Amino acid sequence: MESLFPAPFWEVLYGSHLQGNLSLLSPNHSGLPPHLLLNASHSAFLPLGLKVTIVGLYLAVCIGGLLGNCLVMYVILRHTKMKTATNIYIFNLALADTLVLLTLPFQATDILLGFWPFGNTLCKTVIAIDYYNMFTSTFTLTAMSVDRYVAICHPIRALDVRTSSKAQAVNVAIWALALVVGVPVAIMGSAQVEDEEIECLVEIPDPQDYWGPVFAVSIFLFSFIIPVLIISVCYSLMIRRLHGVRLLSGSREKDRNLRRITRLVLVVVAVFVGCWTPVQVFVLVQGLGVQPGSETTVAILRFCTALGYVNSCLNPILYAFLDENFKACFRKFCCASALHREMQVSDRVRSIAKDVALGCKTTETVPRPA
């Protein structure tokens, strides 16, 4: 077996290292099929300024996304009123985003150095996390959309189906289903020496010209197209239902809440699709045998990949702007943190003032020498 797909998933398109100049790549290079030749290298080919820009973007996304997603998970765990079915799915999405954001410093280092310096174990770990995130995110968004469909179109059935415990069970099933992809990919992944550089790769079995396209197209279908189709059907039915009746639950307040949550889920799904469509399309094109042929195209691919990771730090911002409960909890957390800091400063000032006063008093009571 030869290493075909640089993994994690972002490397499927253009790999971990370009061999100096794209014009030097030929269909016979390393025995790779033509549509996978750009899996040879990217970092050594890109200008240093561009690499630094991409690395800076990765690190900014990492820091902002970790803070936001950890806050989302804390709020859901801390407040009982936040443990709704929808928020349980949001917790799962935040968990998947947090895990993949933790891999960005390693990816950024790989981009900057032009090779993988972290060894075989971390290679397998990063590969597994990246694939887990890809599938758990799309599966969770699909589950959220089906959940909203049941709430809007089948409100009576929703009373029994839409519970926190059942949402948790669905989340467990999502991670178990993601294992079907993640474990084999992690097993196939390894850090290997390719063309005098260490690369983190997934080995595709022979015949490579058959399994390579099958791998890429399967990823495209099961991690993107099929979930998006299911989501589209759910929202088409919901929109028809929302336009067909004035009151869904008999209460205007409950109706406003239903529509608000549905709008939140729709926006989260739309942003996800917008962020991931470019890189997913490139994966499909690459899998079908069409390869990019210029430095500009490779740079665009890299930024499209970065856009996919930007999605992981956008979700907490969307929750803060579109959901009143999250907004209130975020505000409460920030105010409590600010109040705690003020109290610490105040206590410190009082302590210093007390020490100064005590020192002055001691000085005054000391008898002067005759």
Swiss-Prot record:
Cited function: G-protein coupled opioid receptor that functions as a receptor for the endogenous neuropeptide nociceptin. Ligand binding causes a conformation change that triggers signaling via guanine nucleotide-binding proteins (G proteins) and modulates the activity of down-stream effectors. Signaling via G proteins mediates inhibition of adenylate cyclase activity and calcium channel activity. Arrestins modulate signaling via G proteins and mediate the activation of alternative signaling pathways that lead to the activation of MAP kinases.
Covalently lipidated residues, kind S-palmitoyl cysteine: 334
Listed GO biological process terms: adenylate cyclase-inhibiting G protein-coupled receptor signaling pathway; neuropeptide signaling pathway; sensory perception of pain
Cytoplasmic topological domain: 75-87, 147-165, 237-264, 323-370
Gene: OPRL1
Protein name: Nociceptin receptor
Family: Belongs to the G-protein coupled receptor 1 family.
Residues marked Important for G protein-mediated signaling (site): 110, 130
Annotated GO CC locations: cytoplasmic vesicle; neuron projection; plasma membrane
Domain of life: Eukaryota
Keyword Membrane: yes
UniProt signal peptide: none
Membrane topology: Multi-pass membrane protein
Positions bearing carbohydrate: 21, 28, 39
Annotated keywords: Behavior, Cell membrane, Cytoplasmic vesicle, Disulfide bond, G-protein coupled receptor, Glycoprotein, Lipoprotein, Membrane, Palmitate, Receptor, Transducer, Transmembrane, Transmembrane helix
Chief place where the protein resides: membrane
Family annotation (PROSITE patterns): G_PROTEIN_RECEP_F1_1, G_PROTEIN_RECEP_F1_2
